[in-house]
UniProtKB/Swiss-Prot annotation:
Organism: Stenotrophomonas maltophilia (strain R551-3)
Entry annotated with the keyword Manganese: no
Site (Positions MEP for the nucleophilic attack): residue numbering on this chain: 157, 213
Name of the protein described by the UniProt record: 2-C-methyl-D-erythritol 4-phosphate cytidylyltransferase
Enzyme Commission numbers on file: 2.7.7.60
Length: 232
């Protein structure tokens, strides 16, 4: 079997768009916080060795876990942006994680990752020299808006995908890509964007639409419905 993989989970965001009194990754669903569901999904896979959870400097809600599902859970302090937090997590990984080893990055508030999706990503991504991301083809019709709010045109969607997580890259390549983007003053919105700036072409691995990010109260309601259906 290939070397075990660590996952970096950026959880330093405050979730301001959600409007809750605490970061959304700490909201309850089905008897435990969202972050617990996320760790369940990640650490259940036999290839995942442990998790580096990146938290905010004033995070009073972090439960203080040191292990989950019998695997180590480490923490470090993140930065002002997602990219800065991911970079901090990569730098804080144990020394046993070599520079050329693949590392996963997964959103803390994306708790409904399926074992099948994670397995496909690992299988495809580790066979590629660059890596891969989970993504979903765009199925809705896309409109381009003008400054006045009117429609300026309809965009072709045939080759458009929505980026999901996890995303899988080699530790040193992703660290360099994120660092160079920060030096250039470029705000990257996911890890693949940083790699693209390096001239790399990560693979797209189709993932389930159920692997959604909890961003609004409606998303939380949707996840609770999923949990209720799963419980029977």
């Amino acid at each position: 079997m290939s070397a075990a993989i660590w996952v970096v989970v950026p959880a330093a965001g405050r979730g301001a768009r959600f409007g809750a009194p605490m970061p959304k990754q700490y909201l309850q669903a089905g008897g435990q916080i969202l972050l617990a569901h996320t760790l369940d999904a990640l650490l259940a896979h036999p290839a995942v060795a442990g998790a580096m959870v990146v938290i905010g400097p004033d995070d009073a809600d972090w439960p203080g876990w040191s292990e989950w599902a019998g695997k180590p859970v480490l923490t470090c302090i993140g930065g002002a942006t997602r990219a800065a937090s991911v970079l901090a997590g990569l730098q804080a990984l144990p020394e046993t994680v070599r520079a050329d080893e693949f590392v996963l990055v997964h959103d803390a508030a994306r708790p409904n990752l399926s074992p099948a999706d994670l397995g496909r990503l690992l299988e495809v991504g580790r066979a590629d020299p660059v890596g891969a991301i989970l993504a979903a083809p765009v199925r809705d019709t896309l409109k381009r808006a003008g400054d006045d709010g009117g429609i300026d045109g309809t965009e072709p969607r045939e080759r458009l995908w929505r980026a999901l997580t996890p995303q899988l890259f080699r530790r040193h390549q992703l660290s360099r890509a994120l660092s160079e983007a920060a030096t250039a003053g470029v705000e990257v919105t996911d890890e693949a964007m940083a790699m693209e700036r390096q001239g790399q072409r990560p693979l797209l691995v189709e993932g389930s639409e159920d692997n959604f990010k909890v961003t609004t109260p409606a998303d939380l309601d949707r996840f609770e419905f999923v949990l209720s259906r799963r419980a029977g």
